[in-house]
């Protein structure tokens, strides 16, 4: 077999791996949501870049079987994500700091493409990139790029060329939320941060204790995805205030968001949100 034939075989084996395995498994989808600002892009007018797109999971699924993937977000098939999610390779996932960021994606080179842009959020890691920027979309998000009645035709293409642009996220009716992760204890706290308007991502999280420890912000460490943790040498004193900083440097403080009687595996919604 000549080298050219070997290259073709390797390409199609990779295609099968990406399309069939993708990031993870699948989950059901219910309805539609709108949680982005389609009138503007981060930094001004939309700057469209080129990327490859594939899809994974079920044809009408939200992607990850565990409802979250490498970012840790829960129930991405429900509001506000409504299954419009994507795995991103490293330039998009950014080692977890890209989790929650929003992108407009469109395609027009395949006959089944509508050319209409759809917005997806980065909720998982793409381990098999095919280009510098690679969106491994949920089945439903990939299908939304197609003309009416052509979603299955587009999915059968497997790999398509797309254009993308970063846009602000908007989560109508939601405040920034903090999910205290399983395994948290009086000396260890891990929280998942989600639903941030604007950048949508988190670059740094700090915690302030009550009582004697109050008044001093302690940096938390990124554990994985959008989960941040604090390993303490003393019993942490609740309630906890949390300060988050976005990739663009915007800060937001959620005072006493985690109460005195907090418990692991519990979601706590704040009363604060980034302005649109």
Curated annotation (Swiss-Prot):
Pfam families named among the record's database cross-references: DPBB_1 (PF03330), Expansin_C (PF01357)
A GO-annotated cellular component: extracellular region
Glycosylation sites: 37
Boundaries of every Expansin-like CBD domain copy: 187-270
Tissue expression: Expressed in roots.
Record-annotated disulphide pairs: 71-99, 102-169, 107-113
One GO BP annotation of this record: sexual reproduction
Record family assignment: Belongs to the expansin family. Expansin B subfamily.
Function as written in the Swiss-Prot or TrEMBL entry: May cause loosening and extension of plant cell walls by disrupting non-covalent bonding between cellulose microfibrils and matrix glucans. No enzymatic activity has been found. May be required for rapid internodal elongation in deepwater rice during submergence.
Protein's name according to its UniProt entry: Expansin-B8
Organism: Oryza sativa subsp. japonica
Biological classification of the source: Eukaryota, Viridiplantae, Streptophyta, Embryophyta, Tracheophyta
Gene behind the chain: EXPB8
